[in-house]
Amino acid sequence: MKILHLSDDGLPDWRVEKSALTAKKSGHEVFFGGRLNNNAKSTIFSEIHRINWTAGAMVGIPYYYHRVKRQIEKLVKQLVPDIIHSHNIGSAKISQDLGLPAVFDDHEYFGMLSRVNAENINLQDTRNLKSGFDRIKQNMKVSFISRQSISNWTNWEKELILSVPTITVSEQIANELREVADGKTKEIIVVPNFPLETEISFKEPQAHGHLSSVYAGGDSKYKQVTNRDISGLTNLFADNDIGNLTIIGWENAESSEKYKATGFLTRDKMFSEMIQNSIGLIPWKKHWSHPFLNPNKAYEYAHAGLFVMLTSDLRSVASTLEDNCLTFEDYDDLASKLEYFRSNTDELYGRRLKIFNFARKNLFWEKHEQKIMDAYKLI
């Protein structure tokens, strides 16, 4: 069987590649269509093909949308896939328009994402535009794209979950989608974004002589992201006796005595850096979208033997980790709890061992991957 994975993003994309690897292990041939850059490569896909997505196409502006639709139609005629695995809402909608056998991978919960994107667009800085007229034009443009995204993505998502098998990353999202569709969804399958078992065969974590925390994420440095806001985090460590902080993904120009940044790391180097720490943080300031987010960094932390601390409204993560994590309300609360662990290192080490063993038994991709093959059978 031929399976074509479509995305409005490029490679590497570990969620897309894990899904493809699942099918490939079962003897199927997998292909990729999406944005390609100079670093686009994969040993998983038989072929990778360029699809020129634009912002207009992604939000359904007819001229741009139909240009991408023609590209996908041409690619489908060339490859003749048995199944389309759509990793973005635009390609899922186009697959539906073309009458193709498709699965919709709604791992972003696109109706929610459209509203978050609208918030972020409204925060864009237009101070560098040359004139007031330029600012007006820019504001009109982003306002139009924002409205299109919210309207189309919300409507498309409802159409898709009523008509095609849908994969998502948490029970919270699945339940919300069922409620949106009044319980009339086709089939909604939960496949959490856990690491592959083959990449997490780590030894039992070792005790550390000092307290150190890590945050993995290149987001939120050069632009405001309303639901991943970590502003003030580095100052929190600089101003308090709560150990050191490493941020994986940020460039290291601002490193100091209590804080360092690693820049981008490959996955193996990322895990090697994580292991040097004791606590994995998800320190996003509270946001209405958080109950529906299920970031995979929490589970990477767990496999690296890090005790996970996260904002209390990230309920999907807290539910998955059960009692193997600790939530906080704000940065003052986070600082207080880090101070406690600085003075109670034996307790912290015990918690690290506990979450490490919990992860080895429960938090790996292969435990759920058969659900993807089951979704294909529903088409």
Regions found by a protein language model. Name each.
Residues 16-17, 21, 194-257, 263-271:
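Conserved catalytic-core segment of nucleotide-activated headgroup transferases in glycan assembly
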Residues 138-201:
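Donor nucleotide-sugar binding/catalytic pocket of nucleotide-sugar-dependent glycosyltransferases
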